[in-house]
Amino acid sequence: MNKIILLLFSVLCLMGRAQGNSEWKMCVVSDVHLMAPELLKSDGKAFQDYLSSDRKLLGESVEIMDSITNRLLAEHPKVLLVTGDLTKDGENVSHQYLVDHFLSKLRRSGVRVFVVPGNHDVNNPHAVVFDGDKTRRTTTVSPSEFASVYADYGYRQALARDAASLSYVAQLASGLRLIAIDACKYEENDFDKNICVTGGRIKPATQRFIREQADAAKKAGCKVVVMMHHGVVPHFSAQPVVLPEYLVDDYPAVGRMLRDCGADVVFTGHFHSQDITRDSTVTDVETGSLVSYPHPYRVIEVSGDKMSVTTHNLRSIES
């Protein structure tokens, strides 16, 4: 069943007005975790052990993304936001496969796609090829390579880019700007110890960038909406204690900063859960993973002073 939630956010009203009609549509997907087919040289114990310790349908990730892309082409939104974890583990071949087979198809159809990295996407020691009982490392991407691969999906058309991270600002419509925040800690990943850091934080320099860009947007007469991978508001009471790595570090202060910057809504992912929650600062619209049940994506329509957030789930794939 599709789930529709109506939110009364004046911050997004300009989206409808900017298009010259009463409605404006965008879609949101998260945690695509696409695994390029060539990463599975030979199925065997190594890949099956990996799957048994995870909750992702990695072997079906390409087919899932193909089905979702066809759904999005049918929806034909103005904008698609992808809130991080684009790949299984930051493999260069997975990033290229996602762009070449899916994102480029959406772009050619007229959908403007904007991405932000997740904790799996950059400088990841877990980027491997599975070959029977063994694995071997394969090429991951650096921050600059990530921006190059996704040049047509946020970085080339950015109004401004943060020198300290992969954060950027883009114009979504007349009167509305996107602040895409990179809060990942990929520079702390350790190849010797095979550690990929799950948690996130916003660097002081990036916080200054966000404030400066929010001020520039205000002076230009624009409202702002934010997307990032890590959560800003807890989605259940114990989350800050039992699963703090799924919230950005010092999340209360981050929420206050975003509120002060005029951002009412933050689109997030990371937790592979589908939820919308609000505290005294912002509303966190968390979108679940495409490769985890129930494989959701969101369709967001703005009409007047109402924003409807509709959740659709992928029920089946051909295989």
Report each predicted region and the residues it spans.
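His/acidic metal-ligating clusters that form di-metal
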Residues: L72-V79, R112, R177-A180, F191-T283
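Hydrophobic h-region of N-terminal signal peptides that target proteins for export
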Residues: F9-R17
